C-alpha cells in the first residue's frame, strides 16, 4: 500500500556493517516514502529491477520485503489499494488475487514462499536457507508452519478488532495517498468490510479461535528457540524471518517500515492481548530479531516510474 506525496530526494549510499557483520547500504532516508534511484542507475537497469507489488500492512508482504532488504537487493515497490489490488495481482500472476507479487525477469510470482525461493536462488548471499540439508528441511518446515498456522489467524483476529473502526482502517489503508484514493476507499469501505469478513471468515467465534491459534504459535515459537537464539542452527534463516514477519503485528517493532495504528487507538481488548504476548519470551525474541536483522531498506523508487 504505498503512493506517497512526499518530496523525493537523492541520497548518498555508503557501505557499513549491520549487527551480524553483513555489508549493507546506509541511506540517511532509509524509510523515506520516496527514494529516487541513485545516479548511475539508468533506464535499462530500472527495467530489470525486481518490482514488489504490495499491501504495506500485510504480514506476508513484510516477509518478502524483509528478504529483499536482508539480501540488499535493489527493488521497486508498488503499493496497491486494498480491494482493488486483486485485479492487478491476478493480471500479473494469472492465478492469485493476493499480495505480495514479485515481478522478476518479466515474470510475476504471487506466493511469499515461492518468491523467497526465487530470491534465494538468484541472490544466494547472505543465505536464508541453511547449507546443511537437514537444517534446510527444518527451516522450510518452520516457514510452512508459521505461514499456515499463524498467518491466516493473526490476520483474522486483527481485522475482527479493527474493521468496526473505519476511522482507523481507512487511514491505515490509504496512508500517503492523495485525496482521491482516500475518498474512494472511504466511500467503498462498507462494501469492502463485508467482502473482507466473507473472504476471511471473520466473526466472533472464528476470531476467538484465531486468538487461540496465535497463542499456540507463540508456544511453538518458544519451544523452537535454540541455545543459539535462532530457530534453526546458529544463524538467521528463513524460519526466523517468517516467524518474526508474520508476528510483526504483535511485536509492533520500531523497525517496521510503515506506520501502524497507534497503540493507544487500538481497541482495549486487542491492546491487552498484544501486551500479553509481547511480555512473553517469544515476544522479546521477536523484538530482538527485528533489532538485529531488519536491515535498511533496499527499495529504489525512480521518479520517472511513478
Report each predicted region and the residues it spans.
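A non-catalytic, amphipathic alpha-helix used as a structural packing/dimerization or gating element
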Residues: 134, 138-141, 209-216, 220, ...
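GST-like fold's C-terminal all-alpha helical module
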Residues: 151-261
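Intrinsic-disorder-associated, low-complexity terminal segments enriched in Asp/Asn/His/Tyr and depleted
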Residues: 11-13, 18, 22, 27, ...
Amino acid at each position: 500500500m504505498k503512493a506517497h506525496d512526499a518530496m523525493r530526494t537523492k541520497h548518498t549510499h555508503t557501505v557499513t556493517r549491520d549487527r551480524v557483520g553483513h555489508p549493507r547500504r546506509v541511506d540517511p532516508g532509509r524509510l523515506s516514502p520516496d527514494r529516487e534511484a541513485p545516479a548511475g542507475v539508468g533506464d535499462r537497469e530500472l527495467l530489470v529491477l525486481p518490482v514488489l507489488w504490495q499491501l504495506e500492512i500485510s504480514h506476508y508482504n513484510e516477509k518478502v520485503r524483509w528478504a529483499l532488504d536482508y539480501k540488499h537487493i535493489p527493488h521497486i515497490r508498488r503499493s496497491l489499494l486494498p480491494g482493488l489490488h486483486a485485479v492487478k495481482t491476478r493480471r500479473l500472476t494469472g492465478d492469485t488475487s493476493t499480495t505480495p507479487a514479485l515481478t522478476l525477469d518479466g515474470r510475476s510470482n504471487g506466493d511469499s514462499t515461492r518468491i523467497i525461493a526465487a530470491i534465494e536462488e538468484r541472490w544466494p548471499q547472505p543465505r536464508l536457507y541453511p547449507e546443511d540439508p537437514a537444517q534446510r528441511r527444518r527451516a522450510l518446515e518452520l516457514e510452512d508452519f508459521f505461514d499456515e498456522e499463524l498467518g491466516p489467524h493473526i490476520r483474522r483476529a486483527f481485522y475482527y478488532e479493527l474493521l468496526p473502526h473505519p476511522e482507523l482502517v481507512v487511514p491505515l489503508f490509504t496512508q500517503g495517498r492523495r485525496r482521491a484514493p482516500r475518498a474512494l476507499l472511504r466511500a467503498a469501505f462498507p462494501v469492502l468490510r463485508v467482502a473482507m469478513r466473507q473472504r476471511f471468515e471473520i466473526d466472533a467465534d472464528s476470531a476467538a479461535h484465531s486468538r487461540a491459534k496465535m497463542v499456540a504459535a507463540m508456544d511453538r515459537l518458544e519451544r523452537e528457540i535454540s541455545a543459539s537464539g535462532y530457530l534453526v542452527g546458529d544463524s538467521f534463516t528463513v524460519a526466523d524471518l517468517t516467524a518474526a514477519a508474520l508476528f510483526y503485528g504483535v511485536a509492533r517493532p520500531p523497525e517496521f517500515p510503515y506506520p501502524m495504528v497507534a497503540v493507544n487507538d487500538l481497541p482495549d481488548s486487542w491492546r491487552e492481548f498484544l501486551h500479553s504476548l509481547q511480555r512473553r519470551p517469544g515476544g522479546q525474541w521477536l523484538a530482538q530479531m527485528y533489532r538485529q536483522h531488519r536491515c535498511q531498506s533496499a527499495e529504489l523508487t525512480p521518479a520517472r516510474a511513478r
